[in-house]
Amino acid sequence: MSHDGIDLDEFRTGLADSVLREIAEHLAALAGSGATAAIDLRSLPLTNADRSELESRLGRGEVTVKLDVAGTSELWETRYSGVWWVRHFGDGGRIASERIEIAAIPQILVSHDEDIAAAATRVREEVEAHGSA
Amino acid sequence: MAPRETIGEELLRHGISRRALLKYSAYLATMMALPPMASRAIAEALANARRQSVIWLSFQECTGCTESLTRSFSPTIEDMIFNLISLDYHETLQAVSGAAAEEARLTAMRENKGKYVVVVDGSVSTKDGGVYSTNAGKTNLQVLKETAENALAVISVGTCAAFGGIPHANPNPTGAVPVSDIVTDKPVINISGCPPIAEAMAGTIAYLVTFGKLPDLDALNRPKAFFGDTIHDRCYRRPFYDKGLFAKSFDDEGARKGWCLYEVGCKGPVTYNACATLKWNGGVSFPIQSGHGCLGCSEPNFWDKGGFYRPLSTSTGGGATVIGGAAVAGIGIGVASALISRRRRTDATKEPKS
């Protein structure tokens, strides 16, 4: 995005370096003790260039997931196992929440116990309805 | 009355998975500057909470605040707020009208006595008994007193409800006052702005539902999560201010190069709001990014400060100094007591000198 001579896409503040150092510490902790962590990227004054730099240096790994709940979300594991980029979109496709999660798997991907119980009921009803037809 | 379902139960009944709450929790944590790892605990708290009864009263206002909150056209993360609350009364949005509408308000007040939240947009007319703004045969003043009496808390959305706003501007023909001048015996949260940022309204309500307490407030009773920094502090043009590079008019070289708008009247340095970070219209832009200085619409008496295009360094009748001082003091004070902050607010909203 360019505005009157300021190109916000090109302006780097150096924050990408800082975030990478923080990720490195958290990932070492995950590897050592299993401690999970998260970094809220929206709370940091990242420019578009900073975000692009961070995204590029973390790269993309083997897993990419698209979520469709309360709007869309995109998650991917970076090329560093255990480092996940989690991006939730809001109204008009803007980024509503964006975080780096350092975990074996982001919490939002895990099926919740109550959802599993409700699904078990629903699928039983489906089987019974089909059987009585 | 049968107890309301928990939010988790209701979402489950509608086939919405717990992931929706986890996602909203991440969004809420971002908005309210909460620790990112708190998301899971927030989601659990929300799942076990009951929908918050909300009564929305519209007084001397333009409906811009409601427009700001409901501007979304497709199901998005922002809409989740409507799964967390039971909007029991809202004149613009409710389907019923007339006596049935008023009965809905009275029913919600009766069934949720001491637990409902009152949201007000618009200032309150007090002159001649408040006759200049009435609805259903009652003055706004009467309805506010009656509705707030057994409320848990009151949220004043928009600068009109928070500080009197444009109806309060000189010569204030209706005797308009902010809600906090009328409601003095319970918490009043101010979400100022003309209009306020939707996330600030939704985030504050969601925080109340989740934690059952008020968020940290500044000296003007505004949530610090949204009003903790000035526009100037978070402005992408700030480096030009620091270098002394200013636009002198709206069509000069400085304006074309995107330099700081301080000298063409920007009120960013004394205006506390989150426009520079959350932005508007789905995060597209905010006034300064569009080439116009901040008007200071989230501060008291912004309409009467001597001109939108006059630099702050010229006299503005003392208003800017008072506001800047009060707001800076607020950061040091932390969560101000209602009495102290009310006194400061009264100082800041006093009639400007002509």
Name every feature range the model reports, one short phrase each.
Chain A
Residues 1-53:
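N-terminal domain-onset segments
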Residues 23, 39-41, 65, 86, ...:
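Generic structural hydrophobic/aromatic packing signal, biased to beta-strands
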Residues 33-45, 63-72, 132-133:
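Short glycine-rich, low-complexity/disordered patches
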Residues 49-82:
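Amphipathic, interaction-prone secondary-structure segments
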